[in-house]
Amino acid sequence: MHCPFCSATDTKVIDSRLVADGHQVRRRRECVQCHERFTTFEGAELVMPRVVKQDGSRQPFDEEKLRGGMLRAVEKRPVSMDQIEQALTKIKSTLRATGEREVKSEMIGNLMMDQLVNLDKVAYIRFASVYRAFEDVSEFGEAIAKLQK
């Protein structure tokens, strides 16, 4: 790895630790030439499947879109960023575990609802009302009744 200070090509690893629940390695490095120290983070580059939309179009998986949907659902609710990140990690792991090159957007929506129902019931109803396109109060009532069972 090149030194970010002097661009020397030789650096040595001083310390390595697992971070992010074992999904990343944090390394402290020292340049052999200028002796400056710096930190690097190493993680596996995992390919996510493409998303098949309801209209049949295909697009790359967009983690920020997934995160944005979850953040809107849990807005002003007692859910920590750690809980959100764990839920997103579970969704992504499940998608990768399918082994498929493409997944339907419906599957992603259902995985999101599975995570939200465990995080916060109000957030689940918020997301479901948009995702399932509730049109009247009775549909909200049905969704709430399912939660209470």
From Swiss-Prot:
The keyword Transcription regulation applies. A zinc finger (unnamed) spans 3-34. Binds 1 zinc ion. PROSITE patterns: ATP_CONE. Negatively regulates transcription of bacterial ribonucleotide reductase nrd genes and operons by binding to NrdR-boxes. Keywords: ATP-binding, DNA-binding, Metal-binding, Nucleotide-binding, Repressor, Transcription, Transcription regulation, Zinc, Zinc-finger. The gene is nrdR. GO terms for biological process: negative regulation of DNA-templated transcription. One of its GO terms (molecular function) is ATP binding. PANTHER family: TRANSCRIPTIONAL REPRESSOR NRDR (PTHR30455:SF2). Belongs to the NrdR family. It comes from Shewanella pealeana (strain ATCC 700345 / ANG-SQ1). This is Transcriptional repressor NrdR. Pfam families: ATP-cone, Zn_ribbon_NrdR.
